[in-house]
């Protein structure tokens, strides 16, 4: 009997801060009063030290909850906002996750359906056997101030682990079309998307192209629209999902919430994010139909299984939504996105050059937060060194790798530094002790003044350490985030 192919696990990540759309409208109403119609709810916004890579790492960690990472055989990262044009972005994610060196990694880009297209390819490869494949999608798009999309977009990431075995959702098949329909585009030199007229996009693209693909796809898959229990349309434009459901004969109740009011449209990540959201509440035996749109259409059909109940708890979409903090500081967000040039002072002029030689030698220490544990005494330390720091046994060559990224820690000391430069002053940092041993002088992120205190439990998150603006190079490291 052939093993079933499908989704083995899923996860998600949404940034903590939620910019109120009313704040965006209030700042731009003098120039663009028409934004009032979009000024309800909130959208996710990444912190200054987040990008598609850091968000993908967090979504991957969530996806791999309870999974032996050594079993992962391939990794793909889909996004149209990857920070490096000629450096494997998925390779950085691989290092942060401490996946085996023998894993294959791939960046997928160029279209808003890059996430679903990468997922289809991974599922087809998995059907032929082999190790599970980790599919990640993340997006952090810039939007021109006072534009509609400034309120519509959101930042986020999602992950799916696919392979053979006992999937939580069996893959039943897919259908795809490719058409150079330009609803929007962004050239290599542009910071912002150029978007075409909304009604034409809705009528010709959403209702026309997706509608036709749904009809053909359902027929090719041998499924009636009425049999679909969860219908995922990753578009937040009002009425589009309902219209497509009616056109395909799918019950209106099957339409999955596109998270427009609380998240926004997270681009390439949105189909996978909504799929993760649907799986969080799905029951066994439900048929889930997923749409991807961008210069064509992807249609994917899944059927959930009883394995859903066996998944260990995870943050997921629901947990990410629950940790949100309302934010109405529009100017700060513009500054973090590089759209507002503030006087930063001489301390911001320090050269942040990263020697590639040093990063290569210490990639596990820096990107993977891998410390060392003495095999004779059990003493844990960070960083790992040739000589153990054990009090009574300074053994040489006795340490083994000891990953610390998923180990909780406790704040021992801290300071709020208003002199050093940081895009979110003051700069919080201090000493933390990991459970079971190991101490690190860490920066704190996603914190307010009341969040940092001695004895507070923290976890670690992969973030941007600094940006070498002279060479346009991003340095990554791990930062502490309060738990609870």
Please give the residue ranges for each predicted region.
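Claisen-condensing/thiolase-fold acyl-transfer catalytic domains that form or cleave C-C bonds
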Residues: 57, 81-82, 100-102, 107-130, ...
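Short nucleic-acid-contacting surface segments enriched for D/E, G, S/T with interspersed K/R
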Residues: 446-460
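OB-fold/S1-family single-stranded nucleic acid-binding modules
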Residues: 461-484
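Cys/His-rich short segments
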Residues: 348-410
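Phosphate/pyrophosphate-binding loops at sites that engage ATP/ADP/AMP, CoA/4′-phosphopantetheine
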Residues: 59-73, 211-229, 248
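Short, acidic/hydrophobic/Gly-rich beta-strand patch recurrent on exposed beta strands
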Residues: 429-435, 443, 479-480
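Short aromatic-glycine-enriched beta-strand elements
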Residues: 419-431, 475
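Condensing-enzyme catalytic core mediating Claisen C-C bond formation in acyl metabolism
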Residues: 1-52, 147-204, 208, 283, ...
């Amino acid at each position: 009997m052939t093993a079933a192919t499908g989704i083995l696990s899923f996860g998600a990540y949404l940034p903590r801060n939620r910019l109120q759309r009313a704040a965006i409208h209030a700042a731009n109403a003098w120039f663009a009063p028409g934004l009032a119609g979009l000024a309800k709810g909130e959208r996710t916004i990444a912190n200054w030290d987040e990008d598609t890579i850091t968000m993908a790492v967090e979504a991957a960690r969530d996806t791999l909850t309870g999974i032996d990472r050594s079993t992962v055989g391939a990794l793909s990262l889909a996004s149209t906002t990857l920070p490096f044009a000629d450096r494997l972005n998925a390779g950085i994610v691989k290092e942060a996750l401490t996946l085996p060196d023998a894993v294959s990694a791939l960046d997928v880009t160029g279209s808003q359906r890059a996430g679903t297209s990468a997922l289809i390819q991974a599922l087809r490869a998995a059907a032929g056997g082999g190790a599970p494949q980790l599919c990640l999608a993340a997006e952090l798009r810039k939007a021109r101030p006072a534009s509609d999309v400034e309120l519509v977009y959101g930042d986020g990431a999602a992950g799916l682990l696919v392979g053979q075995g006992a999937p939580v959702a069996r893959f039943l098949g897919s259908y795809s079309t490719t058409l150079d329909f330009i609803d929007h585009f962004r050239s290599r030199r542009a910071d912002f998307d150029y978007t075409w007229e909304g009604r034409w996009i809705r009528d010709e693209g959403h209702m026309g192209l997706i509608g036709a693909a749904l009809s053909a796809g359902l027929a090719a898959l041998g499924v009636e629209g009425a049999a679909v229990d969860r219908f995922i349309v990753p578009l937040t434009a009002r009425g589009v999902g309902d219209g497509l459901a009616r056109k395909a004969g799918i019950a209106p109740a099957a339409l999955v919430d596109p998270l427009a009011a609380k998240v926004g449209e997270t681009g390439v990540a949105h189909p996978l994010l909504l799929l993760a959201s649907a799986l969080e509440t799905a029951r066994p035996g439900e048929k889930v139909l997923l749409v991807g749109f961008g210069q064509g259409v992807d249609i994917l059909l899944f059927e959930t299984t009883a394995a859903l109940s066996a998944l260990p708890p995870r943050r997921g979409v629901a947990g990410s939504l629950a940790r949100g903090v309302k934010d109405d500081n529009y100017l700060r967000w513009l500054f973090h996105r590089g759209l507002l040039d503030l006087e930063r002072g001489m301390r911001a002029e320090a050269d942040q050059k990263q020697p590639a030689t040093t990063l290569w030698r210490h990639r596990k220490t820096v990107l993977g937060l891998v410390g060392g544990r003495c095999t004779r005494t059990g003493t844990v330390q960070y960083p790992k060194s040739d000589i153990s720091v054990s009090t009574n046994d300074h053994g040489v060559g006795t340490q083994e790798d000891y990953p610390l990224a998923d180990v909780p820690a406790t704040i021992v000391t801290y300071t709020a530094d208003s002199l050093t430069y940081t895009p979110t002053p003051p700069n919080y940092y201090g000493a933390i002790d990991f459970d079971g041993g190991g101490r690190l002088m860490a920066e704190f992120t996603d914190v307010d003044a009341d969040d940092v205190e001695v004895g507070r439990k923290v976890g670690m998150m992969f973030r941007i350490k600094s940006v070498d603006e002279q060479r346009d190079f991003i340095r990554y490291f791990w930062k502490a985030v309060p738990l609870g």
